[in-house]
Amino acid sequence: MVKSRKISILLAVAMLVSIMIPTTAFAGPTKAPTKDGTSYKDLFLELYGKIKDPKNGYFSPDEGIPYHSIETLIVEAPDYGHVTTSEAFSYYVWLEAMYGNLTGNWSGVETAWKVMEDWIIPDSTEQPGMSSYNPNSPATYADEYEDPSYYPSELKFDTVRVGSDPVHNDLVSAYGPNMYLMHWLMDVDNWYGFGTGTRATFINTFQRGEQESTWETIPHPSIEEFKYGGPNGFLDLFTKDRSYAKQWRYTNAPDAEGRAIQAVYWANKWAKEQGKGSAVASVVSKAAKMGDFLRNDMFDKYFMKIGAQDKTPATGYDSAHYLMAWYTAWGGGIGASWAWKIGCSHAHFGYQNPFQGWVSATQSDFAPKSSNGKRDWTTSYKRQLEFYQWLQSAEGGIAGGATNSWNGRYEKYPAGTSTFYGMAYVPHPVYADPGSNQWFGFQAWSMQRVMEYYLETGDSSVKNLIKKWVDWVMSEIKLYDDGTFAIPSDLEWSGQPDTWTGTYTGNPNLHVRVTSYGTDLGVAGSLANALATYAAATERWEGKLDTKARDMAAELVNRAWYNFYCSEGKGVVTEEARADYKRFFEQEVYVPAGWSGTMPNGDKIQPGIKFIDIRTKYRQDPYYDIVYQAYLRGEAPVLNYHRFWHEVDLAVAMGVLATYFPDMTYKVPGTPSTKLYGDVNDDGKVNSTDAVALKRYVLRSGISINTDNADLNEDGRVNSTDLGILKRYILKEIDTLPYKN
C-alpha cells in the first residue's frame, strides 16, 4: 500500500513537471569539464561511476536490472524505456568485465551474471514441460506473412511436416531439458501490468511479419494465462489454432548471448593475468553452458533442409545453416505436458559473432559439455567469417544477410538471386519498417567482434575483409574543426553479392551509400572500440601500428564525451528530434475484424486503434506533453535520452584505449594543438633534461611526464624506443619529431 501511494505521488509530480516544461526535455548535453591529459582509465572510471550511481536511474532499485534508458517515454525496438532487453544484460556483463580489468575488482562480473540468471534467463519453474519436448516433432508449422493484416496465421497440423531437431538430445545429455538462454524482452517495472506488483515480468511484442514495426505491435505476456486480451488471451491475434491452451513461450536474440560470452572471455583472460582467475571461474562455467545452448540458433525455423526452396523436412544437420539466426524460440503448456521449439530461417550479418564462436570452439575454459558442441562451433565460426566476406560490398560495408525461407513460406527464390550455401540473399532480413540493415550501428557492433577475433587469432584470412571495412568507415567519419563529429546513420543498399563459391570476388554489383549522418553515442563508442581493437591487432600481427585507426578511435571517444556530457552528471546524453513520434497518434495497430480484448489497465484492443490507445499510461509520462504539444504544432519533439547501452559502449571504448594504448590521454577536441614533441617535462624546450626525465620514466622511477609529447614515434606507447629517438634528436642525428622509421 505504501509503495503504491509513493508511486502515485511520483506520477503526480512527474505530470506537474511535464506541464511546466513545454519544449525540450531535462538533463541535456553540455561541454565536459574534463582536462587535457586525463587518462582513459580515469575517464572510464568516471563514466562507470555515473552509470552505477543509483541516483542516476540506470538500474531498477529493487532487482538491479539495467533499464533500456533512464527516460520512460521512448520507442525504438523496446516501446518503453523501463522495458529492457537481453542486450542490456549483456552490456552489463561487458561493463563489469572492463571494470575488473582496470581495477582488479571482479565482483561485478559475478553480480551482473547473477542478475541475468535471476531475471532474464527463464528458470525451470518458468519453462515447465520441457522434458516432454519431442525433437522428432519440434513444432507445428505456420506461414509467415509480410504484413500484420494477414495474421493470425493458421497452424497446419496435417498438411505440412516439419524436420527433426538434431541438437536437443545432445544438450539434454549434458545439462537436462531446460534451455539456458535469455528471453529478449522484459517489463522491468511491470508498467503494462501483465505481472504482479512492480516485479519484472517477461513480455513480447513482435509477432506479425516484416512490416510490423514497433509502432504496430500489440504487447502481450510471455506467460499466457488468459487474464488479459480476449477469451484466448492474445494467442488468436497471432495464430489460428484448433483450440487454445494456457502456455508460456520465449524468444532469444543471439547477439546478446554472444556479447555476454565475449565479455566473459575477456574477464577470464584479464583476471588470470592478474592472478585472480578463480574470481570469475563460476561465471566462465555458466558462459560455456550458454554457448552450448546458443547452438539452437544455428538451425532453420522448422528444421527444413537448407537450400531446398520448399518445405522439405530435414534429418540430422541438413537443417543447420550454422549462422546466428535472428532468434530461436521455445514454449510449452501451463499445467500440461507438451513443449515446442523452433529455430529461425533468417540470418542477419549484424547478429553474427565469430569471436564468440571461436571461443566456444577452441578455448578449454569455455568448452561445451555436449558431445557435438565443439564440432558445431568450429563449423559455425568459420561459416560466419565466410558470411561477412560474401556480404562485403564493393565499398567495404557489410550487406544484410540471407534466408532459407523466401517470404517466410519456403517459396522458390526469384531467378538470379545470389546464394550462400543454398540460402538466398536479402538486403534487410526479418524487418522492413525500417529495413533492418538501414541502421549503421550493426556495422560497428558486428565488425567490432571480427576485430577481436583478429586480435586474438591473427587469422590472415580476415585481414582483407577488415582492412577494406576500416578504410570505408574511416572515409565516412566527419571530424569538424569546432570539435564536433558525425558518423554514418542510415545506409542505402543496391544490387546483390555474387553467389558464394568460397572466395571473395569484390562484389562489383553490391553497393552501399551513406544517406544520413548523426552522433549516435553508442555507435560512436562501438566504432571507436572496433578501430582501437583493429589498431592493436595490426601492431600485434602486422608489425606496424595503424596509427590513423588508433587516433580516430580516440577522436570519437573524446568528441562524444566532450560534446554530450550530461549537465546533471548522468554520463552522456543525446538530444534527438523524433519526427517518428507522430506515430503515437497516427499509427493504426491492426486488429482483426470482430476481435476485441483489454490490456491490464483496461485499454480496449479493437479494430481501428492507434499506438497510444493501448498505451494510455503514456499520458502520465513526464515527456508526454512535450510530444503531444509538438505533434499539435506539426513539429518533431526534441528529447534527451540516456540509453544504458550507449553509456556502456562508450565506457568500454574508453577501457579499450586504456588497455591497448595506456600512454594515450584525453584531449579536449577542437582546441589548437600545443604538442611539442620531445618536451617531456613541459618546460617549453627540448634538451638533455628531457632525455634524463624520459629515461627515469622508462626505468619506472615513478616520475610524471607528458606522455603525449614523449610518444616520439606515435605508436601509442612510451618506451626505450622513444628514448633512443630523443637522444638522436638532441644529438642532431634526426631533424624532426615525431620520427617514424
From Swiss-Prot:
GO molecular function term, any single one: cellulose 1,4-beta-cellobiosidase activity (reducing end)
Predominant localisation class: secreted
Regulation: Inhibited by cellobiose and lactose, but not by glucose.
Reactions listed under catalytic activity: Hydrolysis of (1->4)-beta-D-glucosidic linkages in cellulose and similar substrates, releasing cellobiose from the reducing ends of the chains
Chain positions recorded as substrate binding sites: 76, 140, 204, 241, 247, 251-252, 301-302, 326-327, 421, 520, 645-646
UniProt signal peptide: 1-27
Record-level GO cellular component terms: extracellular region
Key words of the record: Calcium, Carbohydrate metabolism, Cellulose degradation, Glycosidase, Hydrolase, Metal-binding, Polysaccharide degradation, Secreted, Signal
Domain of life, per lineage: Bacteria
Compartments where found: Secreted
Record-listed E.C. numbers: 3.2.1.176
Binding positions (Ca(2+) 1): D679, N681, D683, G684, K685, D690
Residue ranges annotated for the Dockerin domain, each copy included: 673-739
Record carries keyword Secreted: yes
Annotated binding of Ca(2+) 2, by residue: D711, L712, R717, D722
UniProt enzyme class: hydrolase
Pfam family, one: Dockerin_1
InterPro entries referenced in this protein's UniProt entry, alphabetically: 6-hairpin_glycosidase_sf, 6hp_glycosidase-like_sf, Dockerin_1_rpt, Dockerin_dom, Dockerin_dom_sf, Endo-1-4-beta-glucanase_dom2, Endoglucanase_F_dom3, Glyco_hydro_48F
Keyword Acyltransferase: no
Binding site for Ca(2+) 3: D711, N713, D715, R717, D722
Active-site residue numbers: E87, D255
Biological processes annotated in GO: cellulose catabolic process
UniProt similarity note: Belongs to the glycosyl hydrolase 48 (cellulase L) family.
Function recorded in the entry: This enzyme catalyzes the exohydrolysis of 1,4-beta-glucosidic linkages in cellulose with a preference for amorphous or crystalline cellulose over carboxymethyl cellulose.
Protein name as it appears in the record: Cellulose 1,4-beta-cellobiosidase (reducing end) CelS
